[in-house]
Amino acid sequence: MTVRVGINGFGRIGRNFYRALLAQQEQGTADVEVVAANDITDNSTLAHLLKFDSILGRLPCDVGLEGDDTIVVGRAKIKALAVREGPAALPWGDLGVDVVVESTGLFTNAAKAKGHLDAGAKKVIISAPATDEDITIVLGVNDDKYDGSQNIISNASCTTNCLAPLAKVLDDEFGIVKGLMTTIHAYTQDQNLQDGPHKDLRRARAAALNIVPTSTGAAKAIGLVMPQLKGKLDGYALRVPIPTGSVTDLTVDLSTRASVDEINAAFKAAAEGRLKGILKYYDAPIVSSDIVTDPHSSIFDSGLTKVIDDQAKVVSWYDNEWGYSNRLVDLVTLVGKSL
C-alpha cells in the first residue's frame, strides 16, 4: 500500500524530507507519496527553494506551479496549503492523508500534534524531540518497540540519531557505566546571521563568525530509546560556522575494558550487520565535507578511537539534515506498514 503523506512545514527539514523521499523512490525503497504540504510561505517561493538548494544543489527535475494551489515536481503533484489556524484545521481527512510529517518545530507536544489526528490523519511523526509523545524512535536502536498502537511518534533529533547507535554498540558489547558527549554541530536557522536578540545569549551571536556553545538534549534523550542508560549520559553542543555536516564525540566509562582494536571491531561488525544502513564505518581520515549527503545516521571514524584504562572515546560524523531526513522517510515507511 502506498503511504499518503502530508507535510506540515516545508522548511529545511520538510524540503530535505521530500528530496530524500525522491532519492529513495528512485532506489525503489520507499512506497510513499506526498499529497500535500502546508506552509504559510507563498507557493512560488516554496517551489524555488525546493528546486534550488545551496547544499544539495539543483533538483534534477522540473519544479513549477499548476494553478494557485499545486506544486508540480516532475510528474508528481503536491497540494499546497496555507492554513494558519493550526493542525486541527488542516484537510487531512479530505485528502486521504495517512501520515503527517510535522516539521514546523511549533507542534512538538502531544496535545498540539493531536490536532493532525483530529483533522483525519492516522499517524503523526514529529521531526524533533517531543513532549508526551506515544513513543520516540531511533531507527536501528528501538524501532522494534513500535507496534502500530502508537499514533504520535517522535523521530528524536539528528544528534540523538547519531549518538544512539554509538551508545548501543558500546553498551551491548562492553557496558556503559556513564559518559559525556559533545556534538560539534553545523549552525541552524535558530541562530542569528548577525548579533541580535535571542533567548540563548550565545545563540544571539553571529553564527558564521563564532564557535557557539549551547545546549543539546541528545544525551538525555538516550534514556527514551535505551532506558537502561537513563541518567547515565549528558553533554552539550558547539555550533560551528558550516551549513551542514556535524560530528559527535562520546567519552564513556566501560564496564568491561576494551582495546581500540576491540572497540573498532565491534563497530565494524555492527555497521556490516544489525546496523547496516544506519551506522557506517570509516577507516579513511575524513573531514566534515566528506559526509555531506551521506544518508547514514552515524558515520563512525575508527581513526579517532581512544582508550585509557576503562575509559573510551569514540567519534561519529553525521549530515544533520540529510541523514535525519532519510530516517524520517524510513520511519514513514515503517509506520505505513502498520496501517
From Swiss-Prot:
- UniProt name for this protein: Glyceraldehyde-3-phosphate dehydrogenase
Q: Which gene encodes it?
A: gap
- Entry keyword annotation includes Oxidoreductase: yes
Effect in UniProt of substituting residue 158 to A: Loss of dehydrogenase activity
Q: Which NCBIfam families match?
A: GAPDH-I
Keywords annotated in UniProt: Cytoplasm, Glycolysis, NAD, Nucleotide-binding, Oxidoreductase
**Which residues of the sequence carry a binding annotation for D-glyceraldehyde 3-phosphate?**
157-159, 188, 203, 216-217, 239
Q: Where in the cell is it found?
A: Cytoplasm
